[in-house]
């Protein structure tokens, strides 16, 4: 009897810990809960591509899944789906570069070994995807070398790069976790916004593309380009969220539509499946980037629902007059399906905050596992470790702020949001150094902890010196965490 009561108690505790963090209720809400989309002035400064040689260049694509772990299934599913879409559109394999850790399809947790799906009734999208850069070869240095077409700088992998010319069109799709000013990677360090924008500027200076389109799925993804991506580079970027909000996982357990019952993880991301499911059903010679942007924006923050994020656009917005086929090609099977200014794909009834999708997986795994099984014990451990890590990081950052700025002023300084159009931080090297100082004493931020990047940026913007940060971090964290979250094991985020 005592054992039974203990198991029930553990289950109740885990459920209480998770209930406020996992899938967001998406029953239709009242007017006060509706997300109001910001009005955006049209900045169509660039004429549409109507010249005779607009289609004479080669189409290139770079697809990046920036995470690892079965609980992050959806990111690699997004990338594999995008690859299949581009191949059906006519892009050659030699012109598509794929980055993915490749630990999902044959993972022991995968109920359909050797396959990956991106929607509840979707077909396998894994078969045929080239393994250009996998495992530890999925890193910032290789990504930058690939974008710049620098074969000599690539280490490992297939060696494939974007060997583009002045008339070529490039499409980049990145799906992962993010935080203010940073994108995750399955390796260390993470990808920082200033470095990415510097590489895009170098690519423009090389004169090796005509136009470049960047689709970005991540939390706070607007912060990657806001105040950093100038006009005049012939680059158009859209992001799943603005600079200060989460993006959303979809096709998760308990949602409608739900994944097949044997799956215990989210299959896709809301922004990503929105643009891909739209592209997969239309003749892309009849649909512009701007039309897709508007459609994806409506599906990602549907009117009358309490969930969603604000899809944003940056850079040379005039490029959005281009037809999608200039970057993605078009599937001949869709020739008769021209774009209609309405979304036939209904928004899901519920979605899951990107940062909580791992908890959804751990809870589903725990809930379904037989009592007394090794699987249930493993899931219980994963939930408790994840929750403990979150509490440690949150409390440590808050305490650092109070030590540096005082008990009452600390939270105010850490949470300050700069006005629209400004970059996250003035000194990016300062940001990286402050992050390293924190991680030396408090452990790895991880995919969850990068939500606090704005706090570290504000510490820099307030003029705090490295010595002060080192002292504050050492006071906040008297012992370095061990186990999976130690910076000794994971390396540094910066």
UniProtKB/Swiss-Prot annotation:
Asparagine-specific endopeptidase involved in the processing of vacuolar seed protein precursors into the mature forms. Probably involved in post-translational proteolysis of seed storage proteins in the protein storage vacuole of developing seeds. Induction: By senescence, wounding, jasmonic acid (JA), ethylene and salicylic acid (SA). It catalyses: Hydrolysis of proteins and small molecule substrates at -Asn-|-Xaa- bonds. Its main location: other. Keywords: Disulfide bond, Glycoprotein, Hydrolase, Protease, Signal, Thiol protease, Vacuole. The record marks 266 as: Required for post-translational maturation and enzyme activity. Disruption phenotype: No macroscopic phenotype, probably due to functional redundancy. In plants lacking all vacuolar-processing enzyme isozymes (e.g. alpha, beta, gamma and delta) shift of storage protein accumulation from normally processed polypeptides to a finite number of prominent alternatively processed polypeptides cleaved at sites other than the conserved Asn residues targeted by VPE. It is an enzyme of class 3 (hydrolase). One of its GO terms (biological process) is proteolysis involved in protein catabolic process. Disulfide bonds join 252-266, 430-460, 442-477. It is found in: Vacuole; Lytic vacuole. CDD domains: legumain_C (cd21115). The active site is at residues 177, 219. Residues 1-29 form the signal peptide. One of its GO terms (molecular function) is cysteine-type endopeptidase activity. It comes from the Eukaryota. Specific to vegetative organs, especially in senescent tissues. Also expressed in seeds and root tips. Auto-catalytic activation. Belongs to the peptidase C13 family. Glycans are attached at residue 336. Pfam families: Legum_prodom, Peptidase_C13. This is Vacuolar-processing enzyme gamma-isozyme. One of its GO terms (cellular component) is lytic vacuole. Its EC number is 3.4.22.34. InterPro entries: AE, Legum_prodom, Legumain_prodom_sf, Peptidase_C13.
């Amino acid at each position: 009897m005592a054992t039974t009561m203990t198991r029930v108690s553990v289950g109740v505790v885990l459920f209480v810990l998770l209930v406020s963090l996992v899938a967001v209720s998406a029953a239709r809400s009242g007017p006060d809960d509706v997300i109001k989309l910001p009005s955006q002035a049209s900045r169509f400064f660039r004429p549409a591509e109507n010249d005779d040689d607009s289609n004479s260049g080669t189409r290139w694509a770079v697809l990046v899944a920036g995470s690892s772990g079965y609980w992050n299934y959806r990111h690699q599913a997004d990338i594999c789906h995008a690859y299949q879409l581009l191949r059906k559109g006519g892009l050659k394999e030699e012109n598509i570069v794929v980055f993915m850790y490749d630990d999902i399809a044959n993972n022991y947790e995968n109920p359909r070994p050797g396959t990956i799906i991106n929607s509840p009734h979707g077909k396998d999208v894994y078969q045929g995807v080239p393994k250009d850069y996998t495992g530890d070869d999925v890193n910032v240095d290789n990504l930058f070398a690939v974008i710049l077409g620098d074969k000599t700088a690539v280490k490992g992998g297939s060696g494939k790069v974007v060997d583009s010319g002045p008339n070529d069109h490039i499409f980049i799709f990145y799906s992962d976790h993010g935080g203010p000013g940073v994108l995750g990677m399955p390796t260390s360090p993470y990808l920082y916004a200033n470095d990415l924008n510097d590489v895009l500027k170098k690519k423009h200076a090389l004169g090796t593309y005509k136009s470049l389109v960047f689709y970005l799925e991540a939390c706070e993804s607007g912060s990657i380009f806001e105040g950093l991506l100038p006009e005049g580079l012939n680059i158009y970027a859209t992001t799943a969220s603005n600079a200060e909000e989460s993006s959303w996982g979809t096709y998760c357990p308990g949602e409608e539509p739900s994944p097949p019952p044997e799956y215990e993880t989210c299959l896709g991301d809301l922004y990503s499946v929105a643009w891909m499911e739209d592209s997969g059903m239309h003749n892309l010679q009849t649909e512009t980037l701007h039309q897709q942007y508007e459609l994806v924006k409506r599906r990602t923050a549907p009117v009358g629902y309490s969930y969603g994020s604000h899809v944003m656009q940056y850079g040379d917005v005039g490029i959005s007059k281009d037809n999608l086929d200039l970057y993605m090609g078009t599937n001949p099977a869709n020739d008769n399906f021209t774009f209609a200014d309405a979304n036939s794909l209904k928004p899901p009834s519920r979605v899951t905050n990107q940062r909580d999708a791992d908890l959804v997986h751990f809870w589903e795994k725990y809930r379904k596992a037989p009592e007394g099984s090794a699987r249930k014990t493993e899931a219980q451990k994963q939930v408790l470790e994840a929750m403990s890590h979150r509490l440690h990081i949150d409390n440590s950052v808050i305490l650092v702020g109070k030590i540096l700025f005082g008990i009452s002023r600390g939270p105010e300084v850490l949470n300050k949001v700069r006005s629209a159009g400004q970059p996250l931080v003035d000194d990016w090297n300062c940001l990286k150094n402050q992050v390293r100082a924190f991680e030396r004493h408090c452990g790895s931020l991880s995919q969850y902890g990068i939500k606090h990047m704005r706090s570290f940026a504000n510490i820099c913007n307030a003029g705090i010196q490295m010595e002060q940060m080192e002292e504050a971090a050492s006071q906040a964290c008297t012992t370095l965490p061990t186990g999976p979250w130690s910076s000794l094991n994971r390396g540094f985020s910066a």
